[in-house]
Amino acid sequence: MSKKVGFLQGNEAAAHGALYAGCKFFAGYPITPSTEVSEVLSIELPKVGGKFIQMEDEIGAMAALLGGALAGQKALTSTSGPGLSLKQELIGYGCIAEIPCVVYNVMRGGPSTGMPTGPSQSDVMCARW
């Protein structure tokens, strides 16, 4: 019996997990180290009838995410530390309005550009509260 084994990065696995969970809408802005989520979903979402939008910035991505969710879609965006900071006002709006959506935050090491290509746990308190 032969088994097919594949290897994925964590971001690629998260993108495929979102698809399996029924995600049909992604709005994002490419930012390291979360870019692979956008790369995978830009290819795979159209295959399942979903919509992929690359926005002009992180604020626009969060606004589009909330719009997609309000339109009834399972919606996702991905970001990293500085992008999460830019999204705060609209994250607050989404929380107070109880708009169901997913913000996938791939944390960077350091403040914002200390180690921009690697993951860390620097945004835990921001993501938690």
Model-derived regions, located:
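Thiamine diphosphate
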Residues: 1-127
